[in-house]
Amino acid sequence: MKEGAPRVPPGALARCFGRSLFLQAAWNRRGMQNLGFAYAIFPALSALYADKAVRREALARHLGFFNCHPYAAAAILGGTIHHEEKVAAGLEPPGAPVAYKATLQGPLAAIGDGFFWTALRPLFGALAAVGTLLFGWPALVLTLTIYNAIHLVLRIGFFRTGYRRGDDVVGVIARLSLPAMAERLRLAGAGVCGAAAALVAARADQVPRSGALYAAALVAALGYCALARGAPLFLAAYAAVAVGVGLALLTHLFGSPL
């Protein structure tokens, strides 16, 4: 970018990111997350466009349809600010930020849904269930804290990379191999779900905790191995639940050897 070109100050960038945490607060059927996105980017537009008419025009172009995974949208927000700086410097046409958003929202929504919604969150939900059964509410607080720390760190990284790299953010996110990582997390999550089923059944039948813990570990290991060898996810999950309940019932009937 040329010398003396307008830049968004760090404070405004921080406000933009903070506002992005409320991206879905004004969700609507017509524009989906458009109002939340416009609200998030407004501090950057205020820093770039001193003229109210120009600022109003810039804000209006961000009121069009927008829908993405709320965590992955941080990368688009950062990249859009990157392009708005170029528009303010006269290096790009006003439509460039809109085209950037339209191009990335679909692919990043798919990546975000696959990693966060169908892999990371279910895994931590299962861990919270198992941890709460074994150790009580402190385990629930711990798992929630870790999950939120992970997604906040990733969101900050997405936002910074989008702002600094612009279009190159696509390559950076691709190198993270989130789809492959999501598959491994799903395998682990299925195993933990089987362990949770074993613990619930064991608790109901007053099986000693040591026996329940070993049964849960066995179910988790068997479920993970089955999935790693190509077994369908839903079959492995049902089998893990069945084995877990069966172990709990056998232990209840014949006593725990542990």
Task: For the regions a language model picked out, list residue spans one by one.
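Soluble N-terminal domains of membrane-associated systems
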Residues: M1-P93
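Juxtamembrane inter-helical linkers in multi-pass membrane proteins
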Residues: A96-V98, T161-S177
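Transmembrane alpha-helical segments and their cytosolic interface motifs
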Residues: A99-T132
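Alpha-helical transmembrane segments
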Residues: P138-L152
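Structural signature of hydrophobic alpha-helical transmembrane segments
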Residues: V141, V200-A216
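Alpha-helical transmembrane segments of helical membrane proteins, especially in multi-pass transport
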Residues: L154-F158, R175-Q206
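Interfacial loop-to-transmembrane junctions
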Residues: A220-G244
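Juxtamembrane boundary at the C-terminal end of a transmembrane helix
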Residues: V245-L258
